[in-house]
């Protein structure tokens, strides 16, 4: 029987951005006779510098996401039976055809050496995925001892030991353990294993019945346990006597710990026995990526650096990817690899997606506890989607909410523009454009003194700054350019809505606005081109409380404001930071 077919809506949206005839591959999850397509790759014929093909790309996917089909965009020629040979997840591979002009989608399953059309294609969104699946982030440290540069051989042996089941898995939030030999644990489902009726385990400020944390990824934490001793009743122990071999010779030895950080996408109804196999597979994928990282280093350098795993989710991508870089490599040193990933995944070549700063933040990460990311995502949307004249532009990507009294620093009454500037800098950091730290008030003041904008007594003062100074600091510290919009009254701010709409659609950066003695951050605009009605999505830096998302949303510290929000007798300047063109 042919499987049921589900396709993530992000896949279709990404296909719309491909303007030429190409072939590629599909990747998805097969569970309970339902194939869910999550992503695709493109066959790149001229990428000779970095060897990333459809099979190695699968290693970057969470475990349980496999190569599942073939993709044709536009007019293509390819022998389908030959193309299906690398697909193991199903006996009925998927053939997916997308036509540009009509945005037509045709899907076929390859059954008994014939293509059978799929009549019912269920297009789903990310929230639908999370109703059935959850990410599991498995981490641990594996000891390695290498001699005379045999690192690849040692990694292969380590992978074989892992695959043979010589590890255990711990779920710390529930104090639950999973082993290869489950004599004492009945074969329960993942949902039962995690007991998901318990309070949300991520951000401490987000508890049961409250808003979910925004801008971060929620994943189940798991740890790797190494088996130190053998099973007491193992046949190996009964039949074999210990043997000690002593060889005296000179050799070079290196000892280190291999850091494992890997992902799985598991169905809540998956049995614990199957789950163990999936988690083992995730470790093996991670080790293979680490092997490739070391092999690439051996070809280009005599100095070896440990491999570090990072997880990424490009904007509108729909799922996570794992990428391994040599520890300490700069963005310049990883550029060729990142460019190849952009090409094979059909991503924009003018924006960075896989720099260190682009790595996702998890709810369980310690740094997430002290700051909120993208609080506007928690606002209930009530847009009139049927109104074709209403246009909406929203900040693109991640930012951190900076406001009064953070960092144990009292700037209540004078530091609002400083905090808005910090929010903007956080956007550039989280999009991978810079690794410059978030500037403190003192650093901002020193910068303005150094460029000659302020006198020396400005440092350590409580003097305000405005949008002009914000632009100076951005240009000086980050090297980015800005544009400035001016409104002589609060009513004129609404007249600049088309300019703001264009900014958010093209640049996507937060906008700092200053008027009178107040500064705010504009995150978006909702504009009706016919009636002129406009609303502004405002992030207010004057908030003095803790990082409590429900309070921030319900009390209006982050929310949509009408044109009456702006004072009629105030003069306003807006600083519109520009997005660099780079990868």
Question: Where in this protein do the model-derived segments appear?
Answer:
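Eukaryotic basic, amphipathic alpha-helical target segments in cytosolic regions
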Residues: 424, 428-433, 452, 478-482, ...
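Short coil/turn segments at secondary-structure boundaries
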Residues: 122-123, 148-151, 156-157, 183-184, ...
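A compositional signature for long Ser/Thr(±Pro)-rich, low-complexity
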Residues: 349, 353-404, 409
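Low-complexity, Gly/Ser/Thr/Pro-rich intrinsically disordered linker/tail segments
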Residues: 533, 538-583
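Intrinsic disorder
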Residues: 407-418, 457-468, 491-495, 507, ...
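Active-site-adjacent substructure of cysteine-protease-like catalytic cores
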Residues: 11-117, 125, 134-144, 150-154, ...
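Active-site nucleophile-adjacent alpha helix/oxyanion-hole segment immediately C-terminal to the catalytic cysteine
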Residues: 2-44, 387-460, 475
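Long, charge-dense tracts
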Residues: 48-370
């Amino acid at each position: 029987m042919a499987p049921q077919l589900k396709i993530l809506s992000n896949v279709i949206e990404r296909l719309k951005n491909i303007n030429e005839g190409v072939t590629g591959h599909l990747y998805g999850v097969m569970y309970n006779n339902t194939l869910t397509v999550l992503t695709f790759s493109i066959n790149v014929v001229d990428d000779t510098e970095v060897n990333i093909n459809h099979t190695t790309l699968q290693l970057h996917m969470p475990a349980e996401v496999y190569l599942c089909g073939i993709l044709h965009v536009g007019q293509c020629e390819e022998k389908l039976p030959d193309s299906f040979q690398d697909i193991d997840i199903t006996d009925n591979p998927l053939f997916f055809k997308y036509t540009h002009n009509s945005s037509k989608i045709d899907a076929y399953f390859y059954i008994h050496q014939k293509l059978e059309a799929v009549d019912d294609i269920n297009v789903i969104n990310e929230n639908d995925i999370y109703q059935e699946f959850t990410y599991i982030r498995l981490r641990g440290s594996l000891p390695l001892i290498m001699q005379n540069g045999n690192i690849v051989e040692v990694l292969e042996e380590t992978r074989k030991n892992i695959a043979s089941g010589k590890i255990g898995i711990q779920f710390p939030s529930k104090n639950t353990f999973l082993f290869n030999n489950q004599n004492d644990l009945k074969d329960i489902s993942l949902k039962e294993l995690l007991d998901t009726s318990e309070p949300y385990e991520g951000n401490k400020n987000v508890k049961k019945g409250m808003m979910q944390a925004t801008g971060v990824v929620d994943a189940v934490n798991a740890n790797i346990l190494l088996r130190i001793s053998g099973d007491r009743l193992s046949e190996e122990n009964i039949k074999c006597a210990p043997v000690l071999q002593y060889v005296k010779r000179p050799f070079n030895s290196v000892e280190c710990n291999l850091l494992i950080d890997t992902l799985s996408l598991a169905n809540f109804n998956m049995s614990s026995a199957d789950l163990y196999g999936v988690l083992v597979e995730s470790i093996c994928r991670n080790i293979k990526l680490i092997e490739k990282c070391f092999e690439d280093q051996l070809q280009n350098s005599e100095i070896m650096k440990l491999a570090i795993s990072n997880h990424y989710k490009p904007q509108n991508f729909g799922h996570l990817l794992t990428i391994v870089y040599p520890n300490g490599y700069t963005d310049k040193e990883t550029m060729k690899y990142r460019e190849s990933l952009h090409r094979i995944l059909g991503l924009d070549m003018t924006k960075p997606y896989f720099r260190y700063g682009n790595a996702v933040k998890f709810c369980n990460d310690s740094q997430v506890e002290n700051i909120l990311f993208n609080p506007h995502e928690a606002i209930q949307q009530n847009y009139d989607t049927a109104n074709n004249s209403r246009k909406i532009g929203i900040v693109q990507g991640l930012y951190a909410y900076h406001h009064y009294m953070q960092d144990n620093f009292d700037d209540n009454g004078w530091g609002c523009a400083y905090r808005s500037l910090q929010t903007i800098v956080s956007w550039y950091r989280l999009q991978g454009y810079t690794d410059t730290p978030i500037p403190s008030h003192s650093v901002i003041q020193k910068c303005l003194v150094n460029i000659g904008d302020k006198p020396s007594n400005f440092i350590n003062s409580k003097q305000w700054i405005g949008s002009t100074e914000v632009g100076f600091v951005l240009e000086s510290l980050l090297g980015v350019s800005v544009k400035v919009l001016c409104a002589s009254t609060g009513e004129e701010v609404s007249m600049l809505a088309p300019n703001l709409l264009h900014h958010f659609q093209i640049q996507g950066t937060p906008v700092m606005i200053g008027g009178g003695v107040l500064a705010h951050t504009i995150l978006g605009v909702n504009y009706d081109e016919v009636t002129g009605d406009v609303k502004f999505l405002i992030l207010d830096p004057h908030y003095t409380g803790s990082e409590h998302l429900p309070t921030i949303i319900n009390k209006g510290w982050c929310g949509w404001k009408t044109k009456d929000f702006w004072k009629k007798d105030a003069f306003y300047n807006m600083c519109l930071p520009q997005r660099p063109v780079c990868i």
